[in-house]
Every structure is written in C-alpha cells, then in structure tokens.
C-alpha cells in the first residue's frame, strides 16, 4: 500500500510536469491525540475485556493529505492517510502503523453533462446524522464522530447531469476499499442513483444489486419550510448478510441466519437554526433489523453463557427505535466549533451523552476534545462495553 501511495504521488507530479496547463494543489492536516476509556468491569458482552480487547489508553498520530491535479477535461484526486498508534490495556501494549489511500479518483469529462470516473470514492449521501438508512455502505456515516475518516469504495462511475435540477449515476462496485474482508457483500455490485432538486427541496433514489446479495433500495429527501426550519428523512429496504436471531423466548437458543428477511429502516428529522446561527436537530430512527425490547433482554440473558457469539454477531443496532438530538454552534465560525449530542434507545431506555469541541489556537493550529458518557447498566446497548471515554488532541493545518 505504501508503494501505491508513492506511485500515485509520482503520477500526479509527472502529469503536472508534462502538461503546462494542469493545475496542481495540495493541503493536509496533521493530527495528534490521546484517548482514555473506562471499560465496564461487569460487562456481559466483554467479560474481563477478553473478547473485544478494547484499549484503555491510546495515543495516535495521523497525517491526512489531499492531492489534486486537473485540466479542462481530466481531474486526478487522492486522499492519503498515514497513521501510527499505541494502544494499551491492563494486559498488554501494542503499536501499529499504516499508510493507504482512503480516496482516489480519475475523473474525465466526456461530453457536455457526461462524466466518467474510476477509483476509491466515498459514496455518501442523505441528511441523517445518527444513521443513514438510505446508504448501504455507510449506515453509520461518521457524523457522530467528527474525527472519523470514511474510506471509499473501489468503483467506476458514469454520471449524467443534464441540468442544475437533475442527475443520474451508474456505479460498478469492485470492492469495499481498504481492508476489505473476503466476505464483501457488495463486491461486483451495480448501483443506480437518481437525484432531483428544486429551490427548496431535494430528493434522491438509490438501488443496488450484487451477485450473491438481495437488492437494496433507498430514498432520501429534504424540504426547507423557512429560513430557519428544515425537514428531512431517509428510507432503506434491505436484508442483512448475517443476522443473529434472538427470540424473546429465553428457552430458545441464538441462531445465525444468512440473508435475513427484508426489513425497512427509516429516519425522520427536523433541524431549526436560531438567530445566533446555532442549530438544533431532532431525529427519530426505526430499524426493522433491530430487536424488540423483549428480544434485546433475551439477547443479554443468552450472552451470559455465549458472549462470543453475542458480541461477534451482534446486529448493527441492538434496538429498533431511537431518538437522537444534536445542538451545535455555527459551522462557519472562525474561532471554533462545539456540538452536544444525546442518543436514546427507546427499547432498553439507555442513553448516551457526547460532546465535541474545538478551538483555534493560531491560524494553523486547533485543539479539540470529544467526551462520551453512556448512561445505563451492562444490559443496555450504549453502556454494555464502556462507562466513559475522553479524547484530547491537536490538529495542524498544512502547508
């Protein structure tokens, strides 16, 4: 992978040198941060931290570079990541490093309104913050953690934009990008996507089919009702490649089902922007793949004797119904940014409080912090593994 980084960088440099009409730019961010987590000592899913091996302390250094070279018809872009981390728990300390391209793309303007592209692209869409039901690749879209880096899908795309109101894309998925597992449900899949937008509204439709995976269907939209109020929503219909069945009847065992029954997941949200440019978002999520309250209770009861399968095959969300609130400052403020988040599992009544903030120390340097405080016991989703965590860091803008 390090060779791939050097090769791509050489291609950008060579192209820029050979073509005098090419424009090249680059920027980046250097991160350094430490994280401390207090693990739950009475965890049912991870007794003694022997299964998940979660770090109690970690130190991370990360470099993120954005490279671009473009002419009138061709654009080359890459996002290169280099990381070093030291992770420690009560039993051991581990060090690791990695370098990879989280995104890269070669984009060609074929004719007016038509573009062809290939590379590793983050296929992200939809306005949801807690989760993104309309997206088969990034259900957890990373918006709850501003430090998270999404990795793109290896793909080739042809897109048509006949006017400012409409666009359509056809994408072939080769694999799920960096660190792809052999069990990749969307390998060799085809994605069709259509978008339509007006002055106050936007709508998108998505369909995806892979050879060995039932089709995924998604939709998302938003409507601006006033200068202050935005309504939005997302919808997805899918199966899960592997589903851990947890019957409410505790006398029945866990079963693992391949290609679970088709279920619908939906998110409804509203965002209100105040006169001081702060905003409040409220979201409700229903995940048809999650457990009912009785099924989740049986899940934790079975996990007492089978923690390995309970943790290893756990669904993406344990519950079916969630409430998520976000109160944040003005995103365009030059001096800093803060965000407060509250999530509640409406089935097991567990909560999670989180806060993120960053402040500008100089034109190039910012300090940031992320605190997460689950509220509940060992039989509730948010508090099943960790009692609390705190991350403190610095980031330096390059060049």
Which residues fall in each region the model found?
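Outer membrane beta-barrel
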Residues: 67-168, 173, 376
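Outer-membrane beta-barrel "beta-signal"
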Residues: 323-327, 359, 373, 384-399
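Transmembrane beta-barrel strands of outer-membrane/channel proteins
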Residues: 28-36, 78-84, 118-120, 170-174, ...
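Residue-level signature of outer-membrane beta-barrel architecture
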Residues: 20, 24, 65-71, 108-109, ...
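Repeated loop/turn-to-beta-strand initiation elements of outer-membrane beta-barrel proteins
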Residues: 72-77, 113-116, 165-168, 198-205, ...
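Residues that define the transmembrane beta-barrel architecture of outer-membrane proteins
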Residues: 53-61, 97-102, 150-154, 186-190, ...
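Extracellular/periplasmic loop regions
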Residues: 97, 218, 230-334, 340-342, ...
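Beta-barrel outer-membrane channel/assembly domains of diderm bacteria
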Residues: 18-116, 357, 370, 385, ...
